[in-house]
């Protein structure tokens, strides 16, 4: 794993009035800054039935890793998270149904993102009324998808880069289109010629395959437990909504549809509603 920081601690669990059992909790992250993914690992001397981590107003599910004594969770620090001290509340139950609770501190530091200035078709900066209605409808549809946290975990093992090209635009960049400030870049752009195969970074289920106003031909893959991959600006689809896909399966082709200045792949990751950098995910669970 490519983490740059790791925090470990012990807390006491006292189920059902029995003697306390030690639980080791470790947190790993490339950094504790906006857009980063934090890996939470729990080792218990007593088997647990369920566990979740609540922080930043979101509830992140944890899952047993190999057995009920080892649990893992992924926490997202959203792009707009302010610097400060936050508490991760761990809660769940053991196999006897007794509650398990604890908390741990995360200290989030500030991050400065660069700015990109682009000249694009005016219809993407000031959409006509008909397009505005379409944009609103599409935004609502995508929000409903990202709000769902499925109980099934499709993904397993390390994540893979979906295309071989280098990064050409980083996550979090502040965007200025035709001289007007717009929302920050919530994904990572990879260079690629039109027609380059786009592969699923991990297993999942296709929950959207449609043409959207801004991101053009778009695919969303539900990897489970609130994690989604969003691929934009494709030239073609190789899957349909409802399809279950395997890691490295071709799901589409690089294109230049929607709001673009040239062909590339836009890859966004959502984790229980938080906007995180795909490269942060790869640093923890990448290959």
Where are these regions (language model features)?
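Bacterial N-terminal signal peptides
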Residues: 2-14
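Cationic-aromatic interfacial patches
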Residues: 19-105, 110
């Amino acid at each position: 794993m490519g983490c740059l920081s790791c925090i470990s601690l012990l807390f006491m669990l006292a189920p059902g009035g029995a003697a306390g059992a030690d639980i080791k909790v470790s947190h790993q992250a490339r950094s504790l800054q906006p857009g980063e993914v934090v890996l939470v690992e729990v080792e218990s001397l007593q088997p647990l039935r369920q566990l979740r981590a609540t922080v930043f107003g979101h509830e992140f599910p944890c899952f047993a890793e190999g057995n009920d004594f080892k649990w893992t969770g992924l926490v997202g620090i959203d792009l707009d998270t302010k610097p400060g001290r936050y508490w991760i509340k761990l809660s769940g139950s053991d196999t006897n149904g007794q509650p398990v609770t604890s908390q741990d501190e995360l200290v989030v530091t500030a991050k400065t993102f660069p700015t990109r200035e682009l000249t694009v078709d005016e219809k993407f900066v000031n959409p006509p009324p008909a397009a505005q209605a379409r944009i609103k409808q599409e935004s609502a549809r995508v929000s409903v998808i990202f709000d769902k946290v499925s109980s099934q975990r499709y993904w397993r093992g390390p994540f893979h880069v979906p295309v071989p090209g280098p990064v050409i635009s980083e996550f979090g960049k502040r965007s200025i289109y035709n001289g007007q400030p717009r929302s920050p870049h919530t994904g990572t752009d990879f260079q690629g010629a039109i027609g380059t195969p786009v592969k699923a970074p991990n297993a999942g289920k296709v929950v959207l395959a449609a043409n959207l106003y801004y991101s053009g031909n778009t695919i969303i893959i539900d990897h489970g437990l609130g994690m989604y991959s969003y691929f934009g600006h494709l030239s073609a689809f190789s899957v349909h909504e409802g399809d279950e896909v395997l890691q490295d399966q071709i799901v589409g082709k690089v294109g230049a549809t929607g709001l673009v200045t040239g062909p590339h792949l836009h890859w966004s990751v959502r984790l229980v509603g938080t906007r995180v950098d795909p490269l942060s995910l790869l640093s923890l669970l990448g290959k």
